[in-house]
């Protein structure tokens, strides 16, 4: 059995995967959406809506749904992965036997491989081999606003310029979605992963009641940390001033649609880490990434004081006020340093 031939298969029927599928379909593309829970997918088929994550957003007629993964993967050579980073590798392993010979893989997952801190491009190459074109979508995007058709801008980077151009054509919409192509594959991935950590810090600052001034300072210092690590890992520093860097960082640090920010707010208000995670109810990418990024910082000999203090708070129960004083004391001592 074969699925309807489409321009894109979207793997992951959560809020963001569904929003991207809706956006692609609104652009006149045939799109197939697959989710791991067949009951959820069947409910969407009947309702023509993802009531669990995006209620009241009706699916375009060119958005199709499929419960069988092998059948779904016959629909297109273009496969968009939109799953949490902690299951990214297992999802690739699952889809590998069913991919078409001409398959191309793009992901909108933001994060690093859990426990190793590896970039998702390295995970993908290890599992799929080096012959499959790879791409990443990142940038300041909340699923609800994207699904509602509100103006949004994203960045795309790919290992193949043809793939990048094809993705831009599929996604770009003059009315609502601006798509920027970037050749910095490493930087676009890092920006999407590291901003979650800084967003937790911004949330803690706001939970403590430190105000807008402190939040702005933390975002600025956080961007400097991201840029330093990115440069050490081979990224282009200017990438972090674009959509995949500053754009995503500002969005995630300042709006309560961000679960990483909400998680930080709870901790700043005195809620224990594990309780805060349960209250959020969804994967908090920045929590696991904090430990992994600190390992990367050590490996590349990059100073990341905000990440270090967040690690102490999240994994060693350091008092949040003491962590803030540590940062303030450091910046006073380093006041002659011109580079943030």
Swiss-Prot record:
Keyword NAD among UniProt keywords: yes
Reactions catalysed according to its record: sn-glycerol 3-phosphate + NAD(+) = dihydroxyacetone phosphate + NADH + H(+); sn-glycerol 3-phosphate + NADP(+) = dihydroxyacetone phosphate + NADPH + H(+)
UniProt xrefs under SUPFAM superfamilies: 6-phosphogluconate dehydrogenase C-terminal domain-like, NAD(P)-binding Rossmann-fold domains
Gene Ontology terms describing biological process: carbohydrate metabolic process; glycerol-3-phosphate biosynthetic process; glycerol-3-phosphate catabolic process; glycerophospholipid biosynthetic process
Catalytic machinery residues: 195 (proton acceptor)
Record-listed sn-glycerol 3-phosphate binding positions: 110, 139, 141, 195, 248, 258-260
Pathway membership: Membrane lipid metabolism; glycerophospholipid metabolism
Primary location group: cytoplasm
InterPro entries attached to this UniProt entry: 6-PGluconate_DH-like_C_sf, 6PGD_dom2, G3P_DH_NAD-dep, G3P_DH_NAD-dep_C, G3P_DH_NAD-dep_N, NAD(P)-bd_dom_sf
Pfam families referenced in this protein's UniProt entry, alphabetically: NAD_Gly3P_dh_C, NAD_Gly3P_dh_N
Enzyme Commission number, as recorded: 1.1.1.94
Keyword NAD: yes
Family membership noted in the UniProt record: Belongs to the NAD-dependent glycerol-3-phosphate dehydrogenase family.
Record's protein name: Glycerol-3-phosphate dehydrogenase [NAD(P)+]
């Amino acid at each position: 059995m074969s699925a309807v031939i489409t321009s894109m298969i979207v793997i992951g029927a959560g809020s963001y995967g569904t929003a991207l599928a809706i956006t692609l379909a609104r652009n006149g593309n045939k799109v197939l959406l697959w989710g791991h829970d067949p009951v959820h997918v069947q409910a969407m088929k009947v309702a023509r809506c993802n009531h669990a994550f995006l209620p009241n957003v009706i699916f375009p007629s060119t958005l199709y749904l499929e419960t069988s993964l092998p059948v779904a993967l016959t629909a297109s050579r273009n496969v968009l992965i939109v799953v949490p980073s902690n299951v990214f590798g297992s999802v690739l392993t699952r889809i590998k036997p069913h991919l078409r010979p001409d398959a191309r893989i793009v992901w909108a997952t933001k994060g690093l491989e859990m426990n190793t801190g590896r970039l998702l491009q390295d995970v993908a190459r290890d599992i799929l081999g080096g012959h499959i074109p790879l791409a990443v979508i990142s940038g300041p995007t909340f699923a609800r606003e994207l699904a509602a058709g509100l103006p949004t801008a994203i960045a795309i980077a790919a290992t193949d310029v043809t793939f990048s151009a094809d993705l831009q054509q599929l996604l770009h919409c003059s009315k609502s979605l601006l798509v920027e192509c970037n050749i910095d594959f490493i930087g676009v991935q890092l920006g999407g992963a590291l901003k979650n950590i800084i967003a937790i810090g911004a949330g803690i600052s706001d939970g403590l009641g430190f105000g807008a001034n402190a939040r702005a300072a933390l975002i600025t210092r956080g961007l400097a940390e991201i840029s330093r690590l990115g440069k050490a890992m081979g990224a282009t520093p200017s990438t972090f001033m674009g959509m995949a860097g500053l754009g995503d960082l500002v969005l995630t640090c300042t709006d309560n649609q961000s679960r990483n920010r909400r998680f930080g707010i709870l901790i700043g208000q005195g809620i224990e880490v594990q309780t805060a995670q349960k209250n959020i109810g969804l994967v908090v990418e920045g929590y696991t990434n904090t430990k992994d990024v600190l390992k990367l910082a050590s490996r590349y000999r990059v100073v990341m004081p905000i990440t270090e203090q967040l690690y102490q708070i999240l994994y060693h129960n350091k008092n949040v006020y003491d962590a803030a004083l540590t940062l303030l004391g450091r910046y006073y001592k380093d006041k002659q340093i011109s580079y943030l």
